[in-house]
Regions:
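Hydrophobic transmembrane alpha-helices and their immediate loop junctions
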Residues: 1-234
Length: 234
């Protein structure tokens, strides 16, 4: 995101989208947890839309450097309550993805015109969206259209990033919450969560380039390119 400072409008949209997306993500997870009987989430005010509660400092670093980050992890109940673990872990990413899809469909239906056919094709084939989330671009012409487009992509990528099965991301925390209590899984949990190796892995993949591109953004570009082709109509 810091690389987008050369494009102030892009930087502003990315910053607002990140904060809104993270707060929504953590808030709905907190609401779901409290609704399903989690008193700890209530005490920690996870069911309140307060940015300081939901913004994770390491996730914010990832967003500032790599363009994407994650919310402060919420405690999952584990195997003793599989249903609650699944619902709480997945509701946050689902909200981000739904918001992203909605914004991109809004752009296509009502605001199309800010992105050329060639630029849209880059987003839908090989996925230039990840690069734009990191570096931004100039809002030449239809500023509102560009803002909606960039915010939509930001939310979509944020939601899918959260599903990657590496802690502290939601997908990784859900994986270990549901994992059996075998020695192998306990060792993996100790290293990836207890010693924060998972956090280091995610940050490295998100902020260090591989062949000129950030690894996680490159992976997300490939995964999301087919969906972007449909949403953007290219």
């Amino acid at each position: 995101m810091l690389y987008a400072l050369g494009h102030p409008a892009s930087f502003g949209v990315l910053l607002v989208s990140f904060v809104v997306g993270i707060v929504l993500h953590g808030w709905v997870q907190g609401l779901a947890a409290v609704a399903m009987g989690d008193s700890v989430a209530r005490l920690e005010k996870r069911n309140k839309p307060e940015p300081r509660v939901h913004i994770d400092p390491f996730g914010a670093v990832g967003a500032l450097i790599g363009g994407l980050g994650w919310a402060h992890p919420i405690e999952l109940p584990g195997r003793r309550d599989r249903r609650r673990a699944v619902v709480v872990a997945l509701v946050g990413p689902a909200v981000n993805v739904a918001l992203g899809v909605g914004l991109l469909l809004l752009w296509r239906a009502a605001l199309n015109g800010g992105l050329s056919a060639g630029e849209a094709a880059v987003w839908g084939h090989a996925g230039g969206a990840g690069t734009d989330l990191q570096h931004g671009f100039s809002f030449a012409g239809d500023a509102l259209g560009f803002a909606v487009l960039l915010a939509g992509a930001s939310q979509l990528y944020l939601g899918v990033l959260s599903l990657i099965p590496i802690p502290p991301l939601d997908g990784g925390r859900l994986l270990f919450a549901l994992a059996p209590s075998t020695l192998g899984w306990q060792r993996a949990r100790h290293h990836l969560i207890g010693q924060n190796i998972g956090l280091v892995v995610v940050l490295v993949m998100l902020v260090l380039p591989l062949g000129g591109r950030l690894l996680l953004l490159a992976v997300l570009d490939q995964v999301l390119a087919p969906l972007l082709r449909v949403l953007l109509g290219v």
